Amino acid sequence: LTCFNDFSPTAHTVEDCQRGITTCYMKTWRVHRETVIERGCGCPKVKPGIRLKCCTGNTCNY
């Protein structure tokens, strides 16, 4: 599985996930009126106030 793995609004870099990982994620949250975006492999638990989207399929976390 290949997922985007960067911290910007436009996804540019990718990573090959470790064997056995079947999902990609995109987390978003607000900091001082700006939206922060984090992408990567897996589907992590998040704190309240953080939006999480998990998906299956190569580069689905755009």
Swiss-Prot record:
Keywords: Acetylcholine receptor inhibiting toxin, Disulfide bond, Ion channel impairing toxin, Neurotoxin, Postsynaptic neurotoxin, Secreted, Toxin. Signal peptide: none annotated. The keyword Secreted applies. GO terms for molecular function: acetylcholine receptor inhibitor activity; ion channel regulator activity; toxin activity. Disulfide bonds join 3-24, 17-41, 43-54, 55-60. Binds to muscle nicotinic acetylcholine receptor (nAChR) and inhibit acetylcholine from binding to the receptor, thereby impairing neuromuscular transmission. This is Frontoxin III.
